[in-house]
Amino acid sequence: MALLAVEGLRTQFATSGGTVRAVDGLSFAIERGEVLGLVGESGCGKSVTSLSIMRLVPPPGRVTAGRILLDGDDLLDKDAEAMRRVRGARIAMVFQEPMTALNPVFSIGDQIAAAVRAHEGGGRRAAWERAVEMLDRVQVPSPRERARDYPHQLSGGLRQRAMIALALAPGPQLLIADEPATALDVTIQAQILDLLRRLQADRGMAVLLITHDLGVVAELCHRVAIIYAGRIVEMAPVAKIFEEPLHPYTRGLLRCLPHPSRFGQPLSSIEGAPPDLRQAGAGCRFAPRCPLALESCRRDEPALDERRPGHFVACPVVSV
């Protein structure tokens, strides 16, 4: 049994301009110890997927269909109190911008200690020592002193390390990392990614990595799911995505990557724009931008089929 199985997930936002189908029938699974990358353009539904799993979708959004199974236990059936016990202890999340995720009026150590006590009990002193230990494990220098600091007193890189320490302190089985290094400079970004890789290997936990950066995926992930306009269009082991991409959208994304062999040449781009999810009709949502689209692509929604062992693609046109 997979650690996490998402089946037919649909999350919608009711707005004055219509219903936004941000996540529209997503299905995927994550095995224990696996790192799965969820990749796509801004606005494709990556972060809404993670918030749906955590049951943190803000109003006016709501999950309208599907199942989210954690060890076979459907999270959508849990009440608010039961879900609070799941968050942190079994699933934790590292947010893209820790300055808005951390509480500005409590010290870093107090926030980590509070998470430890909420899920494991124990006294204040033991929880504080655990907080210092976690800051040390994520390579925060002078962890005992930094534990007394407030979020605004730390640099962006140290805040992200503190956010990781807070997420991992209760020992979750699954970590959701939503663009964990996007807001950081390149050097600090590399350090954070290396830290995540080491912690994942040491703890053997599963990770859902949400990103638009294919370079990050190549470094960290075992498998990758490519999402477009709220639907998964391709899913495969990471090496297969880079070496033998099948879906036209995946191929387009890879062509957009800068490469030394194309120095001095214009960067490639995917023509057109993503669809308005309030008006997305039948058929493949990439069809208006796809150079291979047939009339049937605009009419019929393609199924995500296994074309090769472990390699799934939602496109009737591509051949293998």
Can you say where each PLM-predicted feature lies in the sequence?
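Conserved ABC ATPase "signature" region
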Residues: 73-74, 125-145, 173, 254-255
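P-loop NTP-binding/switch modules centered on Walker-like glycine-rich loops
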Residues: 41, 55, 172, 176, ...
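Conserved ABC ATPase signature
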Residues: 149-154, 158
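Short catalytic/signature loops enriched in Gly
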Residues: 19, 60, 141-147, 235-320
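Conserved ABC transporter NBD signature motif
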Residues: 63-74
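Hydrophobic anchor residue at the start of the ABC signature
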Residues: 112, 164, 188, 192
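A short, flexible loop at the N-terminus of ABC-type nucleotide-binding domains that lies
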Residues: 3, 12-25, 56-62, 79-83, ...
